[in-house]
Design a protein with these regions (language model features):
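Hydrophobic membrane-insertion alpha-helices, especially the h-region
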Residues: 35-49
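Low-complexity, intrinsically disordered extramembrane tails and loops of integral membrane proteins
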Residues: 1-32
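Internal low-complexity, small-residue/proline-rich segments
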Residues: 30, 48-285
Length: 285
C-alpha cells in the first residue's frame, strides 16, 4: 500500500470612440489593403510549408522530449528521496501479491510530478484489478517515449524501465550484493548507498517496445541486464526502431546518450551501484 505519509501529493473598453470609428480613416487607405493582402499570401506560404518543417524537425524534437521526460523522472525521484530519505522500491510493497501483480515504482512517484491521478488506487488489490480499469486507461505523458511508434496494449503502456543491476535475478537480489542496481522489487536505495558515484550509476532508460502498463510491477518496469548484447538485445532494453541512441537517466539527475553498441563492461559498470567498477570517462561513451 502506498504510505499515508506520501503527499497526495481586464480594462474596460473606451466607449467614447469605438474601434471602428477610430480606425475607419486608416481602413480607407489603399496601402492597408495591399499590406493586408501581402500578409495573407505570406501566411498561406508559411502554413503550406509547415508540414514539411515539422517532418524535418520531428525526430530531433522527439529526442529532446524523451530526454525531458527522463529529466522530469529524475527530478521526481530526487524530490521523493528528499521527502522520505530513500528512493521508491521497484514495486509497491504488498507481500501477499506476486511482484508482477503489484503496482510499480511509478505509482508512489506520481505525487511528485505535475500529472496527478484522478482515480483512487487500492494497492493491495493489484494493478490488474477490475476496480483499477479507469486507471489502466490513463496516460501519463512523461512515461511515454515520443520516439516510440509501436502500438500500445493499454493507454497506460510506458516506454521506460528502471534498472535493477546485472542478471535475470537482479531485482530480487539483496541490498549488499555486488550485482545490484538502484532498483529492486523490495529494495529501497539511498543516495549514500550508491558508492560507485551518482554520475556513474544508471537509474532509468528506454525500452525497445512498450510495456503492458507503466503501473505493472515486475519485469514490465524493472529489469536487470541479463543477456548480451545488453542494448537492443534479448532483454528488450535499448533504442526504439529508427533511432540511433539510447537515452539514460543517471543517479545525479543528468541524462546522457549511449550507443546501442556500447561496450558490455561499460553497461555492467553503469548498471550496478556499489560494485567498485571503473566507469570510462563520459566523453568515451
Amino acid at each position: 500500500m502506498v504510505p499515508d505519509t506520501e503527499p497526495n501529493i481586464f480594462r474596460a473598453p473606451d466607449l467614447k470612440e469605438s474601434p471602428s470609428e477610430k480606425f475607419r480613416p486608416f481602413l480607407r487607405r489603399p496601402v492597408f489593403w495591399v499590406s493586408f493582402a501581402a500578409a495573407g499570401v505570406l501566411l498561406i506560404l508559411v502554413l503550406s510549408a509547415f508540414p514539411l518543417m515539422t517532418r524535418q524537425a520531428g525526430p530531433a524534437a522527439r529526442r529532446v522530449q524523451s530526454k525531458s521526460n527522463l529529466r522530469q523522472m529524475g527530478l521526481a525521484l530526487q524530490n521523493y528521496h528528499g521527502t522520505f530519505g530513500m528512493f521508491p522500491a521497484g514495486t509497491v510493497s504488498v507481500p501477499e501479491l506476486p511482484v508482477e501483480q503489484r503496482f510499480s515504482w511509478i505509482l508512489p512517484l506520481i505525487p511528485f510530478t505535475d500529472q496527478p491521478l484522478r482515480t483512487e488506487v487500492r494497492a493491495e488489490a493489484g494493478w490488474q484489478s477490475a476496480e483499477h480499469a479507469e486507471l489502466i486507461d490513463t496516460s501519463q505523458i512523461i512515461y511515454r517515449n515520443p520516439e516510440q511508434r509501436l502500438e500500445r496494449p493499454f493507454r497506460s503502456a510506458g516506454d521506460y524501465v528502471a534498472i535493477a543491476g546485472i542478471g535475470a535475478d537482479a531485482a530480487a537480489l539483496p541490498e549488499n550484493h555486488p550485482r545490484t542496481g538502484v532498483f529492486g522489487h523490495d529494495r529501497r536505495s539511498t543516495l549514500e548507498s550508491i558508492t560507485d558515484g551518482l554520475s556513474n550509476t544508471l537509474m532509468i532508460t528506454t525500452l525497445v517496445q512498450p510495456n503492458r502498463s507503466m503501473f505493472a510491477g515486475g519485469r514490465e518496469t524493472v529489469r536487470g541486464f541479463s543477456q548480451q548484447p545488453y542494448l537492443n538485445g534479448p532483454d528488450g532494453i535499448g533504442a526504439v526502431a529508427g533511432t540511433k541512441a539510447v537515452q539514460i537517466l543517471l543517479a545525479d539527475g543528468s541524462v546522457r546518450s549511449l550507443s546501442p553498441a556500447a561496450d558490455a563492461t561499460l553497461i555492467e559498470a553503469l548498471a550496478t551501484k556499489a560494485a567498485g567498477d571503473r566507469v570510462a570517462d563520459q566523453s568515451e561513451w
